[in-house]
Amino acid sequence: MLESDEQDMAPAWIAERGGTAIGFVATGPPRDEDVPLPGAEIYAIYVLPQEWRSGAGRALLKTAVNHWRERSAATLVLWVLEANSAGRAFYEALGWEADGRSQQIDFGAFSVPEIRYSLRV
């Protein structure tokens, strides 16, 4: 079951099983200026590891994409750690493509590369 919090322009959804949250997706307007408008961004998506392959992640992402499609978004984007091969395979299986943008994000003394994925809706 998906619970929704569609306040303002940054809606989020929670996936539940048996009354317990097992994942979430948070979305909103794109933060990157080069994303064609109207567009949207998946800010975060997370599913508990024990729920991977349960369909929860797919349902969350599909719900978010449909929400923005209904609001005439043409492109959705998300950022993923370059080394996150499982996450990247998940997005690619759902039609997302690396769009050539990359950036470094800093966590204290560490710098981690991210790549951007896009989906035309």
Predicted regions and their residues:
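Acetyl-CoA-dependent GNAT
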Residues: 1-50, 58-63, 67, 71, ...
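C-terminal "cap" of GNAT-fold acetyltransferases
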Residues: 12-13, 38-40, 74-77, 81-88, ...
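Active-site acidic-Proline motif in GNAT/NAT acetyltransferases
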Residues: 48-50, 54, 82-83
